[in-house]
Amino acid sequence: MANYFNTLNLRQQLAQLGKCRFMARDEFADEAGYLKGKKVVIVGCGAQGLNQGLNMRDSGLDVAYALRKEAIAEKRASWRKATENGFKVGTYEELIPQADLVVNLTPDKQHSAVVKAVQPLMKEGAALGYSHGFNIVEVGEQVRKDITVVMVAPKCPGTEVREEYKRGFGVPTLIAVHPENDPKGEGMAIAKAWAAATGGHRAGVLEFSFVAEVKSDLMGEQTILCGMLQAGSLLCFDKLVSEGTDAAYAEKLIQFGWETITEALKQGGITLMMDRLSNPAKLRAYALSEQLKEIMAPLFQKHMDDIISGAFSSGMMADWANDDVKLLNWREETGRTAFENAPQFEGKISEQEYFDHGVLMIAMVKAGVELAFETMVDSGIIEESAYYESLHELPLIANTIARKRLYEMNVVISDTAEYGNYLFANAAVPLLKEKFMDSLQAGDLGKSIPGSAVDNAQLRDVNEAIRNHPIEAVGHKLRGYMTDMKRIAVAG
């Protein structure tokens, strides 16, 4: 198998990278109807597998779980989760031949083995579904030509897919049909029904290509969504403690600070996040973010280049073949960091204090979001896609850190995201230590910036620069489709 993207000519690559269409609400008038009366079999019962299955069942679909024989015999976690939630569970041989739609929600590294096992069992004309296109695009999986291949990719961790559905809403979702596998022309109908069954149609659905989803998803999770939060957490904690801040206070400011800050980002973009600061603090955060963008732009560009070329995927798949030695070592190193092992702070930090004492963190968020967005757009990815992969998902990832620090984030995200996160953070931390952290001033982190006179013209220009960034325009439009967004922050 060869990397699918690299088999395309330049025109085809650009066309698939740039495929992105916001779908009208009336396109989902039938909701999940196209799949009602058909059998949906999910392979894998992790965070996405279980929570998508629960939503689909609540939407009236016939859902069962196909697990490996040994997982059933040994009553592993996947078997327990499926059975405890009242789902029918069976082996591949028992359930796959009956399925109209087989949804592969196992980890990326297992996809090839799963497809090899289920494909001979699938009936003619059935459909195969993914929630991430890595196996199709980067591995280059070849699927039988009578099988329809579709993707429904909720833009958040699996736990939030369920929580937003239970709130009566949903999460923004990308859907796609693999152009090499749509023999009956029903791929889009299947994908739309599946997306509606998870609740995604209530928050907005984008019609994508497999290529656009994979390349933008990898870039977002490696840089701003996970890598920047990990690097920022470690750098900010160490900086605070080195300057005499109580370790417990420093830990809480960072652990819950990302979530509180990005809640404003979720509701009103970078503009609202920056408006939560005093005018002197806003000017300082803007200046810091511009410095960060200049320093980190080459790192963001390198990650995008390696994603586009396939170099990132090749390196990660080599680690898969080597029993995840790099991934496991990086995971262990993260667990040993001072931030992860700091004591808990029992006092209360007010919501505004997270902003006032977190100017550097706000600058990191602004710089990371804008850089990820700009780098993706410069590479041919459409602005709407870049928005979802750089800004929209950030509060959801920050929420995982608020639960159990970096450990929780890395447990919830996929192994692919975790690997890319470490790759980015391991480069960003020394880079910023060398070129940035020693230049910080009093009030940038852990204390409020003192009140001072503000130049009106400078403030006007900064406000205009913030509001006129392209991500703010596209964000305003897309948030208009998400009028039922619920607050998720739990900080206190």
From Swiss-Prot:
<feature type="binding site">
    <location>
        <position position="68"/>
    </location>
    <ligand>
        <name>NADP(+)</name>
    </ligand>
</feature>
<dbReference type="InterPro" id="IPR013116">
    <property type="entry name" value="KARI_N"/>
</dbReference>
<comment type="pathway">
    <text>Amino-acid biosynthesis; L-valine biosynthesis; L-valine from pyruvate: step 2/4.</text>
</comment>
<dbReference type="Pfam" id="PF01450">
    <property type="entry name" value="KARI_C"/>
</dbReference>
<feature type="binding site">
    <location>
        <position position="389"/>
    </location>
    <ligand>
        <name>Mg(2+) 2</name>
    </ligand>
</feature>
<feature type="domain" description="KARI C-terminal knotted 2">
    <location>
        <begin position="345"/>
        <end position="485"/>
    </location>
</feature>
<dbReference type="InterPro" id="IPR036291">
    <property type="entry name" value="NAD(P)-bd_dom_sf"/>
</dbReference>
<dbReference type="InterPro" id="IPR013023">
    <property type="entry name" value="KARI"/>
</dbReference>
<feature type="active site">
    <location>
        <position position="132"/>
    </location>
</feature>
<keyword id="KW-0460">Magnesium</keyword>
<dbReference type="GO" id="GO:0000287">
    <property type="term" value="F:magnesium ion binding"/>
</dbReference>
<keyword id="KW-0560">Oxidoreductase</keyword>
<feature type="domain" description="KARI N-terminal Rossmann">
    <location>
        <begin position="15"/>
        <end position="208"/>
    </location>
</feature>
<feature type="binding site">
    <location>
        <position position="414"/>
    </location>
    <ligand>
        <name>substrate</name>
    </ligand>
</feature>
<dbReference type="GO" id="GO:0009097">
    <property type="term" value="P:isoleucine biosynthetic process"/>
</dbReference>
<dbReference type="GO" id="GO:0005829">
    <property type="term" value="C:cytosol"/>
</dbReference>
<feature type="binding site">
    <location>
        <begin position="108"/>
        <end position="110"/>
    </location>
    <ligand>
        <name>NADP(+)</name>
    </ligand>
</feature>
<dbReference type="InterPro" id="IPR013328">
    <property type="entry name" value="6PGD_dom2"/>
</dbReference>
<keyword id="KW-0677">Repeat</keyword>
<keyword id="KW-0479">Metal-binding</keyword>
<feature type="binding site">
    <location>
        <position position="76"/>
    </location>
    <ligand>
        <name>NADP(+)</name>
    </ligand>
</feature>
<feature type="binding site">
    <location>
        <position position="217"/>
    </location>
    <ligand>
        <name>Mg(2+) 1</name>
    </ligand>
</feature>
<dbReference type="Pfam" id="PF07991">
    <property type="entry name" value="KARI_N"/>
</dbReference>
<comment type="similarity">
    <text>Belongs to the ketol-acid reductoisomerase family.</text>
</comment>
<feature type="binding site">
    <location>
        <position position="393"/>
    </location>
    <ligand>
        <name>Mg(2+) 2</name>
    </ligand>
</feature>
<feature type="binding site">
    <location>
        <position position="217"/>
    </location>
    <ligand>
        <name>Mg(2+) 2</name>
    </ligand>
</feature>
<keyword id="KW-0521">NADP</keyword>
<keyword id="KW-0028">Amino-acid biosynthesis</keyword>
<feature type="binding site">
    <location>
        <begin position="45"/>
        <end position="48"/>
    </location>
    <ligand>
        <name>NADP(+)</name>
    </ligand>
</feature>
<comment type="function">
    <text>Involved in the biosynthesis of branched-chain amino acids (BCAA). Catalyzes an alkyl-migration followed by a ketol-acid reduction of (S)-2-acetolactate (S2AL) to yield (R)-2,3-dihydroxy-isovalerate. In the isomerase reaction, S2AL is rearranged via a Mg-dependent methyl migration to produce 3-hydroxy-3-methyl-2-ketobutyrate (HMKB). In the reductase reaction, this 2-ketoacid undergoes a metal-dependent reduction by NADPH to yield (R)-2,3-dihydroxy-isovalerate.</text>
</comment>
<comment type="pathway">
    <text>Amino-acid biosynthesis; L-isoleucine biosynthesis; L-isoleucine from 2-oxobutanoate: step 2/4.</text>
</comment>
<feature type="domain" description="KARI C-terminal knotted 1">
    <location>
        <begin position="209"/>
        <end position="344"/>
    </location>
</feature>
<feature type="binding site">
    <location>
        <position position="221"/>
    </location>
    <ligand>
        <name>Mg(2+) 1</name>
    </ligand>
</feature>
<keyword id="KW-0100">Branched-chain amino acid biosynthesis</keyword>
<dbReference type="InterPro" id="IPR008927">
    <property type="entry name" value="6-PGluconate_DH-like_C_sf"/>
</dbReference>
<protein>
    <recommendedName>
        <fullName>Ketol-acid reductoisomerase (NADP(+))</fullName>
        <ecNumber>1.1.1.86</ecNumber>
    </recommendedName>
</protein>
<feature type="binding site">
    <location>
        <position position="78"/>
    </location>
    <ligand>
        <name>NADP(+)</name>
    </ligand>
</feature>
<dbReference type="GO" id="GO:0009099">
    <property type="term" value="P:L-valine biosynthetic process"/>
</dbReference>
<feature type="binding site">
    <location>
        <position position="158"/>
    </location>
    <ligand>
        <name>NADP(+)</name>
    </ligand>
</feature>
<dbReference type="GO" id="GO:0004455">
    <property type="term" value="F:ketol-acid reductoisomerase activity"/>
</dbReference>
<dbReference type="InterPro" id="IPR000506">
    <property type="entry name" value="KARI_C"/>
</dbReference>
